Amino acid sequence: MEYDYKLLYPRQVVLVTSQSGEKRSIIALAWHCPLSFKPPLIGIAVGKTRFSHYLITEGREFVLSIPTENMESKVMSVGSRSGKDVDKFSAFGLTPLKADVVKPPLIKECLINLECRVAAELDAGDHTLFVGEVVATHASATKDKLLFDMGGRNFFGIARE
């Protein structure tokens, strides 16, 4: 049976940083969800062929970052190149910040950064569902619009209160 996964859209877009040793990358994702309040758990689905999949598997940590609507072009660029061949921070004008607990960097331009340690992973076909325990949070006081994906590279912003 086939289904059109776009029926599940719109979805909020996030950026996820990962690192193993000195290698780091950023991936744009719309497949993510909160899983638990206590402990605070977040799930992200990452394609098994992605460089970020390798980094998360090896490093066992990631940072989930919430971009603003005005970051749409940067999010598109991040999602269009492999971090295996390019440093996405410098290539796309994003500022890495040292995290408090984990090795992958925060993204300065994002509204929220959630530092996560991999608590579990689930084989999910051509993706892996990484369950991250949130070990530190960073939030901006700005009220910029959140970025959502309608599927097919169509984006829009939603105001937050």
Tell where the protein language model's regions lie, with residue ranges.
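Basic, polyanion-binding surface patches
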Residues: 1-161
